[in-house]
Amino acid sequence: MSLVACECLPSPGLEPEPCSRARSQACVYLEQIRNRVALGVPDMTKRDYLVDAATQIRLALERDVSEDYEAAFNHYQNGVDVLLRGIHVDPNKERREAVKLKITKYLRRAEEIFNCHLQRPLSSGASPSTGFSSLRLRPIRTLGSAVEQLRGCRVVGVIEKVQLVQDSATGGTFVVKSLPRCHMVSRERLTIIPHGVPYMTKLLRYFMSEDSIFLHLEHVQGGTLWSHLLSQAHPRHSGLSSGSTQERMKAQLNPHLNLLTPARLPSGHAPGKDRIALEPPRTSPSLPLAGEAPSIRPQREAEGEPTARTSTSGSSDLPKAPGGHLHLQARRAGQNSDAGPPRGLTWVPEGAGPVLGGCGRGMDQSCLSADGAGRGCGRATWSVREEQVKQWAAETLVALEALHEQGVLCRDLHPGNLLLDQAGHIRLTYFGQWSEVEPQCCGEAVDNLYSAPEVGGISELTEACDWWSFGSLLYELLTGMALSQSHPSGIQAHTQLQLPEWLSRPAASLLTELLQFEPTRRLGMGEGGVSKLKSHPFFSTIQWSKLVG
């Protein structure tokens, strides 16, 4: 077998320099593995080689998480070596084929570690530009833990694609979201684990296995903003029982929030147009109601955690997330339904006050549904004071600004990503970026105009896509009507934004400047950037320094 000479790839501006002896040996070893996979040397003893290999791979994963890449490479090397020796004395043909796939997988990861972290020569003061070492905040690496630590926890609830988990030792609850690893590390997409982002859910720890990354997230118990608004607008149809968790949450939130007030109808507006009929809640047979209120179902890498419904069994068996937990559908009066005529009250807003009001649709019933208002289901009315919307908007803006500063784009920010804490402040669901996780966008967010027009296209995305999403969410909060309902044919370059006459001038101006079809023309981009957005007249009463502090 011929030895392979290796020469390091120079960094920009640096002259090529020969590899160290250790790096040369690494290249030789990788070449030897390729030859041994092709030829094979049956020299394995009768020990259980799978157990020995599993020990080495587990150590490799732990070292990989903690960024000790040299040790991780060595453990992968040892594990592959054990598998190569054992596969030739294993009489089970199916197991041999499975082991070959594992060898290829571990070899690929070893090569990625070598190419990304061991081969590149570093000058003094230089830092790698790929993989976990790209993290701007180095202390975040201490959050990485071995996946075995999750064995002491049990699943007590399921919230669509995330799980509510209880620590058996402390009794505390947290949310776990799993991200599938593609095992093909993107050298263009860096791993970025945001830290210290105000008004965003905290990442407490993360765990890595061979196939997944598990995010251990803070449990925000206030639920989603949209579900809270709907329950405030229609308390008799929110599915709450006396003494429920959601009732206690509302009792805690009410001193902080004065969200809903009667809306003044515009002159010439027919009261009958605002009449809605509310269907009695229907529960899913797979999960008990447990007195919980409806909540918006999250979809994403977004890594979110609204209030969960609690499983009565407490079993760690993970049930498949049901298609719908609790349905609260608002429909136009007289609209037909499979469930028969709607029962319940009809509600007409009345009274007076300088508030924002309108007829708001919820979200599409898959990932964006507010457990009630879906596309084509009619309208549910809420009225929210502009000052309150302004506060929520400012908190969301601060979170997005911090994410952008750390290099993270949300891409498909939608109502399921906006939570409320116990003090009534916005908490964005967790967003991050992983080189081993292929980014995915919520299709319903794109269809319902929460995602920018350029999302899903071939052009490179910028911060402008999140400013569109920000504008789409504000549009729904301020007008009470979703952007996709006002513009069912979508928004093109020539589309004129539909705004109600009673909307304040600063609010109308902000929405118009955010919801520009051309990304470079959106407020928050170009000269002034986010500073210009924060200085918009709509935010004139916001004291940004106190908000961040």
UniProtKB/Swiss-Prot annotation:
One of its GO terms (cellular component) is ribosome. It is an enzyme of class 2 (transferase). The active site is at 412 (proton acceptor). The keyword rRNA-binding does not apply. Gene3D superfamilies: Phosphotransferase system, lactose/cellobiose-type IIA subunit (1.20.58.80), Transferase(Phosphotransferase) domain 1 (1.10.510.10). ATP binds at residues 151-159, 177. The keyword Kinase applies. Pfam families: MIT, Pkinase. Signal peptide: none annotated. It comes from the Eukaryota. GO terms for molecular function: ATP binding; protein serine kinase activity; protein serine/threonine kinase activity. It catalyses: L-seryl-[protein] + ATP = O-phospho-L-seryl-[protein] + ADP + H(+); L-threonyl-[protein] + ATP = O-phospho-L-threonyl-[protein] + ADP + H(+). InterPro entries: Intracell_Sig-Traffick_Protein, Kinase-like_dom_sf, MIT_dom, MIT_dom_sf, Prot_kinase_dom, STK_RPK118-like. Residues 87-115 form the MIT domain. Residues 145-539 form the Protein kinase domain. Transmembrane segments: none annotated. Residues 260-325 are annotated as: Disordered. Keywords: ATP-binding, Kinase, Nucleotide-binding, Ribonucleoprotein, Ribosomal protein, Serine/threonine-protein kinase, Transferase. Its EC number is 2.7.11.1. SUPFAM superfamilies: MIT domain, Protein kinase-like (PK-like). PANTHER family: RIBOSOMAL PROTEIN S6 KINASE (PTHR15508), RIBOSOMAL PROTEIN S6 KINASE-LIKE 1 (PTHR15508:SF4). This is Ribosomal protein S6 kinase-like 1. It comes from Pongo abelii (Sumatran orangutan). The gene is RPS6KL1.
